Amino acid sequence: FTDAQNSKCPHFYTVEDNALTQDWSEKLKEIGGSAFANPPYSRSSYHEKQAVTGVRHIMNHALAMREKGGRYVFLLKVATSETWWCEEADHICFIRGRVGFDVPQWFVPADENQVPTGAFFAGAIVVFDKTWNGKAIDYIQRSELEQIGKTFVEQAKWLVSRGVA
């Protein structure tokens, strides 16, 4: 779920790849690891009668992939009243504090009325993993989550500097 310009991971699906037609579990077996997505919250769109976006389609595909194995981690806005909200997830960790997002590099306002802003809303980390044995529901402070993220980035940089990653 990327335009490739804003990718944060070395392996990703673009709209041309259509993640909703891919076998994520096979890809995870190939690369060894877990999947992360911050999916688009846009309405469903289709290409040749096949969904390419839409959170409900994405959550349905995540559930299907969960059954095939693997860990699928999503950063989602909290929208428990929406039909796509993932009550079937194995773990939901609500983030205390609003989450902000950067405007994509490619975004060009159509006019002066279209002011670019990052979204700020309640978020949750949602995990689909049938081997999950932790709590079903939990909470984390945004500041704690940010610190964990910074630690992972530093570890990744260290591994790269050692030629390991």
Residue spans of the language-model regions?
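Class I S-adenosyl-L-methionine-dependent methyltransferase catalytic core
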Residues: 1-165
